[in-house]
Amino acid sequence: MSNKAVANRYAVALFELAEEKGQTDVFERELELVQEVFETTPQLETVLAQPGLAADKKQALLRDAFQAHLSPAVMNTINLLMERGRYSEIVGLAGEYKQLNDDKKGIAEATVFSVKALSDSEKNQIAAVFAPKAGKRELRVVNVVDSALIGGLKVRVGDRVFDGSIQGQLKRLEKQLVAGQ
């Protein structure tokens, strides 16, 4: 089973529990904290990967680091991953959980490629226009500057791409011209 599939299984189980308790956003914030610690402290994963360190010591390390900041359900999920030797799935669990919570709320992330950095106002306008097209209530816009676009925008929401860039228009024109010969 792939790492993403494993992380997703745990995320689904934790999300269902969070829904029952009415704490989906609380659990998301807690998992974001865990993810941030793992991403900013690469030594933590190195220590957890040590085969010579007993599993109970690894669990104790995480319990000492997180127990004061996490609800019992989130802490138990992390302990379960540790017991099963799946410490590397903890960060993936956080990402999968966030995706589930966003889907439930009708929120998606949009990557907007543009020639120049977009202002907050422009990001808000893009979110307002593309959220209904993507079937979402709200979009979080992440701007990526790409000078190869020449002009215009390219918006990616999940697997869908809306290409209004000059580069994209030139490519489509080229295909039409080649097909017409």
From Swiss-Prot:
GO MF annotations, alphabetized: proton-transporting ATP synthase activity, rotational mechanism
Predominant location category: membrane
InterPro entries: ATP_synth_OSCP/delta_N_sf (IPR026015), ATPase_OSCP/d_CS (IPR020781), ATPase_OSCP/dsu (IPR000711)
Topology in the lipid bilayer: Peripheral membrane protein
UniProt keywords, alphabetically: ATP synthesis, Cell membrane, CF(1), Hydrogen ion transport, Ion transport, Membrane, Transport
GO cellular component: plasma membrane; proton-transporting ATP synthase complex
Regions that span the bilayer: none
Subcellular location: Cell membrane
Pfam families found in the cross-reference section: OSCP
Record function comment: F(1)F(0) ATP synthase produces ATP from ADP in the presence of a proton or sodium gradient. F-type ATPases consist of two structural domains, F(1) containing the extramembraneous catalytic core and F(0) containing the membrane proton channel, linked together by a central stalk and a peripheral stalk. During catalysis, ATP synthesis in the catalytic domain of F(1) is coupled via a rotary mechanism of the central stalk subunits to proton translocation.
NCBIfam families named in the record: ATP_synt_delta, PRK05758.2-4
Family as reported in the entry's similarity comment: Belongs to the ATPase delta chain family.
The protein's assembly and partners: F-type ATPases have 2 components, F(1) - the catalytic core - and F(0) - the membrane proton channel. F(1) has five subunits: alpha(3), beta(3), gamma(1), delta(1), epsilon(1). F(0) has three main subunits: a(1), b(2) and c(10-14). The alpha and beta chains form an alternating ring which encloses part of the gamma chain. F(1) is attached to F(0) by a central stalk formed by the gamma and epsilon chains, while a peripheral stalk is formed by the delta and b chains.
Name used for this protein in its record: ATP synthase subunit delta
Taxonomic source organism: Shouchella clausii (strain KSM-K16)
Record lineage: Bacteria, Bacillati, Bacillota, Bacilli, Bacillales
